[in-house]
């Protein structure tokens, strides 16, 4: 490709820091702007904080009319569910990210489940409720463990795997009565518990063709040994050996093919990234735990470390309907990301922690900012997940060793990280 592209990246997390890192390497990039960004981005890339309201159509379109871009890459789910890609499409600006109809695959768990039922995609049995009393009655007839999910967006924290009836009842009360997730909890999906190993697979689609990125395995629980509450993700590694070639073939034929076909049939070809969170049963059968309409966080940080090619070209081709015949080249070896989080995360956590960050020692270790901000030239924490440390090496063990040896050099009080990322594959 001979084009030069001015790119706008939307988001502020570790995922966006990683995407930006690889976009900057592209020969196609003429200029990168980021909104709202975090404490790790160079000042010259950041748009002013009052540039536009990311969930407001008039504000977004007014800004884009005055500040044209050749491509917009949307990191988080909220703007996509709100309709960001639709608003940009009205101005003929390519967006890497699906329209609001397709984005409901993440915006509503009930919508996602109904699509899976229609397309005969393997997933857990479920029932959706909008009344607290009905959900409690249904619960009485079910065995434990059971999974309780707020229907709408909840930053990865709206799911409870209940190991007792009391725990399930508490989860339902928190969603319906205490409004823990606001309007995202107006409906609740109750589904059967699935046994097996989880894995994440990303598909990049231009609405007609798609290709898969290497599989990753996330670590959602806060503490070592998969203990503690669910989080947005405490670390990941790639590739995930649980996804064999034969399982990958099933994932294509039983999950991605029918899902993309159904979106086309409904008049909404899926453009962007579709993330399948999978459960692989002990006998090697994949089932869908959830779909997301964007790059996963933190999996993106290690998946992109394994890509051997021009990320910007891939995203631009997907956004303009030109990926037929393209495959993502993948490096040999393995990559890992370990998240440094604030004490108390994912509940009430410390903020404004001063961060003393060492230089990344070699080309195989990268430090990606997530919940950080800059004040007077110094970096402080601003979110629950503060940093992601990524290492890529000849094998998973060497990558894990590199990541943890770098983490030990970071001076940040009142923080923690899991010390067993990648344990299932080591």
Swiss-Prot record:
Cofactor note from UniProt? Binds 1 Mg(2+) or Mn(2+) ion per subunit.
| Keywords annotated in UniProt | ATP-binding, Ligase, Magnesium, Manganese, Metal-binding, Nucleotide-binding, Purine biosynthesis
Q: What is its EC number?
A: 6.3.4.13
The biological pathway it contributes to is:
Purine metabolism; IMP biosynthesis via de novo pathway; N(1)-(5-phospho-D-ribosyl)glycinamide from 5-phospho-alpha-D-ribose 1-diphosphate: step 2/2
Positions annotated to bind Mg(2+):
290, 292
Q: What family classification does the UniProt entry report for this protein?
A: Belongs to the GARS family.
What reaction(s) does this enzyme catalyze?
5-phospho-beta-D-ribosylamine + glycine + ATP = N(1)-(5-phospho-beta-D-ribosyl)glycinamide + ADP + phosphate + H(+)
Q: Where is the ATP-grasp domain?
A: 113-320
Protein name per the record: Phosphoribosylamine--glycine ligase
What biological-process GO terms show up in the record? 'de novo' IMP biosynthetic process; purine nucleobase biosynthetic process
Write one Gene Ontology MF term: ATP binding
**Disulfide-bond pairs as recorded:** none
Query: Can the keyword Manganese be found in this entry's annotation?
Result: yes
The UniProt record lists the keyword ATP-binding: yes
Q: Write down the superkingdom of origin.
A: Bacteria
Q: Which Pfam families match?
A: GARS_A, GARS_C, GARS_N
What are its cofactors? Mg(2+); Mn(2+)
State which gene encodes it. purD
| Residues engaged in binding ATP | 139-200
